[in-house]
Design a protein with these regions (language model features):
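Amphipathic alpha-helical segments
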Residues: 4-26, 115-122
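Short, well-structured alpha-helical interface segments that form or flank functional binding sites
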Residues: 10, 29-32, 38-41, 110, ...
């Protein structure tokens, strides 16, 4: 879909600028629910549904070693991955229904600084 159909919020524009500082590029035009970011072999998804509520949330690949993430305060790290359609570079499996869906770890960041630390830890 074209970018004008799903314009970025001010917060999302700031998040993409920080991602760019860490070498991440926008892989394709933003869609309704996600911004797909890539650096080298690392792909993350910015959760646009949560950023609309001023929550910074990023989906990481389910094979990501979460122990590598910064131990500093500011990152909310879940116990298990979450299913969500639309993350085309992540694996799929059946959750509660009959159809497989993509899944990943939804990491929440307390602020822009913790978002930057998260991206730095992934590279």
């Amino acid at each position: 879909m074209a970018a004008h159909e799903h314009p970025l919020t001010d917060l999302e524009q700031r998040l993409l600028a920080i991602a760019n500082e860490h070498g991440f590029i926008l892989l394709r035009e933003p869609v309704q629910y996600y911004c797909e970011l890539k650096r080298d072999h690392v792909i993350v998804y910015l959760d646009r549904q949560r950023s609309a509520r001023n929550v910074i949330a990023v989906f990481l690949h389910p094979e990501t070693d979460l122990s590598r993430l910064p131990a500093e305060a500011g990152l909310g790290i879940p116990d298990a991955p979450k299913h969500s359609d639309g993350m085309r570079h992540f694996p799929k499996k059946v959750n509660k229904g009959k159809r497989p869906s993509t899944y990943g770890y939804p990491i929440t960041c307390a602020d822009l600084t913790s978002f930057g630390r998260l991206l730095a830890s992934l590279t």
